[in-house]
Structures are given as C-alpha cells and as structure tokens.
Amino acid sequence: MTATLSDIRPEAPAVPVQLHRPARTPAPAAGTWSVQAVQELLDLPFMELLWRAQSVHREHWPAGDVELATLLSVKTGGCPENCGYCPQSAEFDTGVKAQKLMSVDEVTTAARAARDAGATRFCMGAAWRAPKDRDIEKVGELIAAVKGLGMQTCATLGMLEPHQAQALKGAGLDYYNHNLDTAPEYYTDVVSTRAYQERLDTLRHVREAGISVCCGGIIGMGEAPVHRAGLIAQLANLDPYPESVPINSLVRVPGTPLADSDPVDPLDFVRVIAVARITMPRARVRLSAGRQQMGDAVQALCFLAGANSIFYGDKLLVTGNPDVDADVQLLAKLGMNGRQVASTEPHDLHHHAP
C-alpha cells in the first residue's frame, strides 16, 4: 500500500487554509540585481552562503514546510522546437512518441490521484511551440476539471498571445510556467527556434492577464558560472519576480544534443538554489527535474538553502522522478511537512498558499 504524507506527518493544530484568493503580485524588490552582484553571492564560502539563504528563508516562510506539486504531460512529443535538452522535440530521436491531448476524464483521474497522495498544485504540460486558439479552449476544460477537485492549477503550453493568456485566466488558471532556461548570452547555444525576447513577451502577457508566473531555468547545459548568475539576475529583475521559480538539473537524455554534457557538481547546484532564495525571498523555489540523480543528502542541502517546493510523483513529463514513497520517507527523515503553507508576509498570502 502506498504511503501518503498524512501517514507520517506529526499532529499539529489545524490551520485554516483558503485555496483561492484574489490575484495580486508581490512587490518588486528595490533596485535591480546585477550579474556581478549575483556572481559574488555564488562565490561566497559555501557555509556562509547557506547561512544567508536560510536566514532569508526564515524571514519569509515557515521553517520545514514544502509545497507538493504534480506535473502531467497532457500532450506529449512532436514539438517543432529544437531545445537541446528536450526529449519531446520532433528533431531528435529519443524514443518519445507523439500523443494527442489527453481527455478531461484522463486528466481528472490523474489529478485526483495526485491530490489523494498529498499534492496541492497540478501542473499540465503540452509540447506545443505555441498553442492554437482551439487548443486553449480544450485546455480550459482541463483547468476547470482540476480546479473542481480543489487543487491549484498550472499550465505550460509554449508561447502565448495576449488574448490566449486572458482566456486561460478566464478558465481559472492560477499559474503559467514559461522558463527562461539560461542567461540570454548563452541561450542561442541551447535553442535557435525561439528568441529569448519571445519568452519574455509571453511572461508579460501572462502577468498582464493576472495569472501568477512560474519561471526558472536549467543548470548543467554546459553554461559557465557567469551564465548561472545571468539567469538568476534575469529572473530576479522581472518586475515583479516570479511567484514560483523551478530550478532544474539537466537530465541527460540520449538522443538530445546535450546528452553528453558534464554532470553538475551537486554543491554548485545547491549554490544556485541558495542564491535564488536570497534574490527572490518570497518566491516558491522548486526542486524540479534532476532530483532522481541527487540523492537524499543533496536534496536536504537544497531545502536548507531555501527550496520549499518539489514536483511530487514518479514522472516529470517524460523523464523520471523519485517515487511518492521515497519523497514521503525523505520528508519524514528531515522533519518537513508537505502541506499547503503561506509566506509569513500577510500581503503575499494569496500567492504562496499552494
């Protein structure tokens, strides 16, 4: 029988949680982060950096709490983009077979299972470069079905036009994911079918529609340390910065151009998590792809550095992820709670109670 978090969570006084609150954005940080300033943080002695990150984290978030989100590929493969890390590109021979958009019943069944296992946010990914309006209409039906289960919803569908973002907002979408992937200076080494500015434009359309932003990047694609600093600076300088910041460690999939990239030094990955926490104190910093290759000790350091969200479930789109039992056991060993918790700053509660 599969364990759930309720099996291992210590009893605590009930805290009323309101799932759906009016959309608001966190206040932008005073000033901007230069790449040099971010690099100086990354270069701090490791223990000093973790101490600073944990101090910032405790100023803004309850200690020991982690958001559980589940990610489902609702339309797999056949993408015309050439992102060098992605096994869903039609340009690469990775063994991924293109599949049509899942039905409402299929998605509802998956979302209900995720909710029953402890997830509070359900993310739906579709391998499109840019969805057509008829696709947006169908995804709207999926959003409504998932929200009917009492879960927060997130979608990642590719580039959006302003009217499409408005339609998703009208369907009840809470979050939209659109990653920057890396620093602008390194971006063309990773993908050539979409401009960096197009990513920024989609983020603007999402923000203007009143949808919360989920935006992060990938570490381990052959980038230099300065490019990691550049990515964090780009994210932190978005006005306002994203409510959710997923940090991925490259999963090297055979058949993709980046399959032979050198592995990321685990402590370097922890450093990126720590600097994301310091520069974006009220964001959910999410451990995303690559957790399966980290091990418990590295994940524990990431939580210490300020990560407070994970993708929960045995698959992320088409790549592996630790199974639910493994995550339940890890959180229990660390004395952490996988539950819905808000930022300790009252004006930010509506964004950070996923």
UniProtKB/Swiss-Prot annotation:
EC number: 2.8.1.6
Catalysis: reaction(s): (4R,5S)-dethiobiotin + (sulfur carrier)-SH + 2 reduced [2Fe-2S]-[ferredoxin] + 2 S-adenosyl-L-methionine = (sulfur carrier)-H + biotin + 2 5'-deoxyadenosine + 2 L-methionine + 2 oxidized [2Fe-2S]-[ferredoxin]
GO MF: 2 iron, 2 sulfur cluster binding; 4 iron, 4 sulfur cluster binding; biotin synthase activity; iron ion binding
Keywords linked to the UniProt accession: 2Fe-2S, 4Fe-4S, Biotin biosynthesis, Iron, Iron-sulfur, Metal-binding, S-adenosyl-L-methionine, Transferase
Pathway where this protein functions: Cofactor biosynthesis; biotin biosynthesis; biotin from 7,8-diaminononanoate: step 2/2
Cofactor(s) in the UniProt record: [4Fe-4S] cluster; [2Fe-2S] cluster
Keyword S-adenosyl-L-methionine: yes
Quaternary structure and partners: Homodimer.
Job description of the protein: Catalyzes the conversion of dethiobiotin (DTB) to biotin by the insertion of a sulfur atom into dethiobiotin via a radical-based mechanism.
Record's protein name: Biotin synthase
Source species: Paracidovorax citrulli (strain AAC00-1)
Protein encoded by which gene: bioB
